Design a protein with these regions (language model features):
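Catalytic cores of the polymerase beta-like nucleotidyltransferase superfamily
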Residues: 1-446
Length: 446
């Protein structure tokens, strides 16, 4: 079985061999190559110690000396070169207390998480596959190297990674590996929010985001997002729905493109339904104010998972607006665009369509036509260059100061009033008209 290694990777491997050491491409790059995918990174494992690697290559960076890792720079690209090693006892369900370097490749491969990630390759020895990773690739199976219980006890994040790899590759998780995750799921609480966030985004933006269901069934969401468990357990007795809140959410994830903001929004768009649920006399469920309450919950959840402010703010706005159904007039759409922001606004249509496609067939055609009309008016507003943000106004603070307005709250208040009038009537967005309106406002404030 042959893998065409990049020229620089071959150069590093050959150079190490010329100096008396072994070296192989290893891990995810081998897996992806065998699957016909283009690896994002190329990692190299070697019998050389980090000091020897540094002595051999002219340009290196110390990126993980304590773990035997040196980055070799070739043509402004970095390649991580790591000494064969054996991991010692794990003290925090994430990192080993110490590592021991070895000259035995098999011992290095034994410490790795899954069989599909425990293969090595160079053009001299070919594929080194001690744990039948190639068999599991062909069978589309995620299986731990050795005993799953041991691998997950060493590093609790591996449990999440098992589901994430399954989602990215379209694989199944082997039975014993699944059983070990169910047993050890509470240990995920020892892993930092930042690391969980990375895995969550990779899963959500994969081809199989509905594998959030597996995280739930294996007990992992109970650790980092218990709100999702409640969603899965909340029915929707309502003519607009045919799934529980959680199952509806999983269906909507499949109806938006693999964008982080969109997938996070769909994951959380109905997060408040379980706390907003009411039942009428006919046994129908209602979820009044769930978008507003859900936006606040979304912000708290994303902050808890250490998402950046921009991501959090975008999801907050989209969750808050996802169920808003104003009468479609240019005035209403302009105000919605102003409220949400012109950059984010197009995503709202994707959110609304996905939400609709995850519901029952009741009035589905009408709902989709409403969204289409909403989008048509939005595009007309763009084509007409109508003002939907303060920065697009033909008057600004400097203009008002020249008209004698002192800098301060009064100036901001005048701009706000002018903007409100422009949102109602975009024909007013001309410099002379706005100055005349400003003079009237100034006079009224004297």
């Amino acid at each position: 079985m042959r893998i065409d290694l990049p020229q620089n990777v071959n150069f590093i491997i050959d150079t190490l061999y010329e100096h008396g050491f072994e070296a192989y491409a290893v891990g995810g790059c081998v897996r992806d190559s065998l699957l016909g995918r283009t690896p994002q990174d190329w990692d190299i494992t070697t019998s050389a110690k980090h000091a020897q690697v540094k002595a051999i290559f002219d340009h290196t960076i110390d990126t993980g000396i304590q773990h035997g890792t040196v980055t070799v720079m070739l043509e402004h690209v970095g390649y991580e070169v790591t000494t064969y090693r054996i991991d010692g006892e794990y003290e925090d369900a994430r990192h080993p207390k110490e590592v021991t370097f070895t000259s035995n490749l098999k011992l290095d491969l034994e410490r790795r998480d899954f069989t599909i990630n425990a293969m090595a390759y160079n053009h001299r020895a070919g594929l080194v596959d001690e744990f039948d990773g190639i068999g599991d690739l062909k069978a589309h199976v995620i299986r731990c190297v050795g005993y799953a219980h041991d691998r997950f006890s060493e590093d609790a994040l591996r449990m999440f990674r098992a589901v994430r790899f399954a989602a990215q590759l379209g694989f199944d998780i082997e039975a014993q590996t699944k059983a070990a995750i169910k047993e050890l799921a509470p240990a995920l609480s020892k892993v930092s929010a930042e690391r969980i966030q990375v895995e969550l985004v990779k899963l959500l933006t994969s081809d199989h985001p509905q594998m959030m269901r597996d995280l739930y069934e294996l007990g992992l969401t109970a650790v980092f997002m218990p709100e999702f468990d409640v969603m899965m357990q909340t029915p929707q007795h309502n003519k607009h729905h045919m799934y529980s809140v959680g199952e509806h959410t999983l269906h909507t994830l499949e109806h938006v493109r693999a964008d982080k903001i969109l997938r996070l929004t769909m994951l959380l768009h109905d997060v408040a339904k379980p706390v907003c649920i009411t039942t009428d006399e006919e046994g129908q469920n209602h979820f009044k104010k769930h978008p507003v309450v859900g936006a606040d919950m979304t912000r708290k959840i994303l902050r808890r998972l250490k998402f950046d402010n921009r991501t959090t703010d975008c999801c907050f706005k989209l969750v808050k607006e996802h169920d808003d159904r104003p009468a479609i007039t240019e005035r209403n759409v302009r105000r919605a665009m102003s409220r949400i922001g012109t950059e984010l606004f197009p995503l709202l249509f994707e959110v609304k369509r996905a939400d609709t496609l995850g519901q029952s067939m009741y009035k589905r055609a009408e709902k989709l036509e409403y969204i289409a009309e909403y989008e048509r008016v939005y595009r007309k507003i763009l084509a007409d260059h109508q003002c939907v943000s303060k920065k697009e106004m033909k008057i600004n603070g400097s203009d008002l100061i020249k008209m004698g307005v002192e800098p301060g709250p009064k100036l901001g208040d005048i701009l706000d009033r002018l903007y409100e009038q422009v949102l109602d009537d975009p024909s007013l967005n001309e410099a002379q008209k706005l100055k005349e309106l400003a003079n009237k406002i100034i006079t009224s404030l004297i």
